[in-house]
Amino acid sequence: MRSFLFFLLILFALGATETFAQNGGKAEPLRIEFAKGKTSTVLTRSLSNDQQMQYIFGANKGQTVTIKNTKTSLFDFKVFSEESFPEGDFDSSPTYTFVIPETGDYYLFVRKKRVKAPRTASFSVTLTIK
C-alpha cells in the first residue's frame, strides 16, 4: 500500500511540475474582446500591493487608444509591445491617449502601487480603441 501511495505522490508531483513549466510559472494575459459594435470596455479587478494584472489586445495601425484610470493614487498602468513600446514605463495619468504605430498585439499591465492603506483595492480602467 505504501508503494502505491508513493507512486501516486510521484505521479501528482510530475504532473504539477509539467503544468507549471508549460505556463512558465506565470499566468497568461487575459485577451480583451470588445462586444460587437463597441469600441470600449471597462477592466475591473482587485489587486494587492505590487500585484499586477496583464491583458492583451489587438489593434490596427492608425487606431487611437485611450486608457482611463480612475484611481491614479492606487494604480498605474503601462502598454508594452516588443516592436513598438519595448521600454514602456508605468504611467499614473488619469487619461493616456496614443496612436497605434503598427498592427498587432499590445499588452496592458495594471499595477497596484505600494501604499500603507489600502493594501488591497479594486481598479477600474477603461480601454477605448477607435
Task: Describe each model-derived feature in a short phrase.
Residues 1-7:
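Bacterial N-terminal signal peptides that target proteins for export
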Residues 7-15:
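Bacterial N-terminal signal peptides
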Residues 8, 28-30, 40-41, 77, ...:
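Residue-level marker of intrinsically disordered, low-complexity segments enriched
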Residues 16-21:
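Sec/Tat signal peptide C-region and signal peptidase I cleavage site
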Residues 22-33, 55, 112-130:
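C-terminal edge strands of extracellular/lumenal beta-sandwich accessory domains
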Residues 22-66:
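N-terminal secretory signal peptides
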Residues 47-113:
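Acidic, Ser/Thr/Pro-rich low-complexity intrinsically disordered segments
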